[in-house]
């Protein structure tokens, strides 16, 4: 149990998808204007990562891995296309659920919801799972932890962005300029976790 807790903490803080690896920056910067929208997208990313990483782990272990289906046959060259297909299917299902049960969040996320399909944070989580050879349970923990870390970062950025509306930001830095500086400072803060050995 201690191993899974340390894997979760590591994926949230030490190896944060957004602030350590800078993955998923397109939606991270675009949807960080309001805390409510950022929180909704963060939940969507947690759900997609929490399902996509373990599902792709099963696909990789039982179909694509060397000698998984038939002795001597290696289908790992199909990793990218297969993982993207699984992620796209999961995002499509999530999009239908949000449209039916949470229409306000669906409309607020707009074009960025389908973009989760090609969000490199999702694909990065799956790639890290393969590279690190996680088991199914480790994949579940890692997927949920990585999604939680990404959500933590985007909600924090959205909160700071909302507060900056009342700040006297120099004209040349308004908009993305101050956002990039803020993200850089947040990443510096998360770098302090990099020395922790779990």
Swiss-Prot record:
Provide the alphabetized UniProt keywords. Answer: Cell inner membrane, Cell membrane, Ion transport, Membrane, NAD, Sodium, Sodium transport, Translocase, Transmembrane, Transmembrane helix, Transport, Ubiquinone
What reaction does this catalyse?
a ubiquinone + n Na(+)(in) + NADH + H(+) = a ubiquinol + n Na(+)(out) + NAD(+)
**Broad EC category:** translocase
Write out the transmembrane intervals. 11-31, 35-55, 77-97, 110-130, 140-160, 176-196
* UniProt entry tagged with the keyword Transmembrane: yes
- What cellular component GO annotations does this protein have? Gram-negative-bacterium-type cell wall; plasma membrane
Q: State the superkingdom.
A: Bacteria
List localization entries: Cell inner membrane
Q: Which Pfam families match?
A: Rnf-Nqr
List, in alphabetical order, the GO biological process terms annotated in this UniProt record.
respiratory electron transport chain; sodium ion transport
Q: What InterPro entries does the database record attribute to this sequence?
A: NqrDE/RnfAE (IPR003667), NqrDE/RnfAE_oxidrdctase (IPR050133), NqrE (IPR010967)
The UniProt record lists the EC number as: 7.2.1.1
**How does the protein's chain sit in the membrane according to the entry?**
Multi-pass membrane protein
One of the entry's Gene Ontology molecular-function terms is: oxidoreductase activity, acting on NAD(P)H, quinone or similar compound as acceptor
- State whether keyword Signal applies: no
Could you describe the subunit structure of this protein? Answer: Composed of six subunits; NqrA, NqrB, NqrC, NqrD, NqrE and NqrF.
What does the UniProt record say this protein does? NQR complex catalyzes the reduction of ubiquinone-1 to ubiquinol by two successive reactions, coupled with the transport of Na(+) ions from the cytoplasm to the periplasm. NqrA to NqrE are probably involved in the second step, the conversion of ubisemiquinone to ubiquinol.
Question: Which family is this sequence assigned to?
Answer: Belongs to the NqrDE/RnfAE family.
Question: What is this protein called in UniProt?
Answer: Na(+)-translocating NADH-quinone reductase subunit E
Encoding gene per record: nqrE
């Amino acid at each position: 149990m201690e191993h899974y807790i340390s894997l979760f903490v590591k994926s949230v803080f030490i190896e944060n998808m957004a602030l350590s690896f800078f993955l998923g920056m397109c939606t991270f910067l675009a949807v960080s204007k309001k805390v409510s929208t950022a929180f909704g997208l963060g939940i969507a990313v947690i759900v997609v990562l929490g399902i996509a990483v373990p599902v792709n782990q099963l696909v990789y272990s039982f179909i694509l891995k060397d000698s998984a289906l038939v002795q001597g046959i290696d289908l790992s060259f199909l990793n990218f296309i297969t993982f993207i297909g699984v992620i796209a299917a999961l995002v499509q299902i999530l999009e239908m659920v949000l449209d039916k049960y949470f229409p306000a969040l669906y409309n607020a996320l707009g074009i960025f919801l389908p973009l989760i399909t090609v969000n490199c944070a999702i694909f990065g989580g799956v790639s890290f799972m393969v590279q690190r050879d996680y088991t199914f349970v480790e994949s579940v923990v890692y997927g949920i932890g990585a999604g939680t870390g990404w959500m933590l970062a985007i909600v924090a950025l959205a909160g700071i962005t909302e507060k900056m509306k009342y700040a006297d930001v120099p004209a040349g830095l308004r908009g993305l300029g101050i956002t990039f500086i803020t993200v850089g400072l947040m990443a510096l803060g998360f770098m302090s976790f990099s020395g922790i050995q779990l």
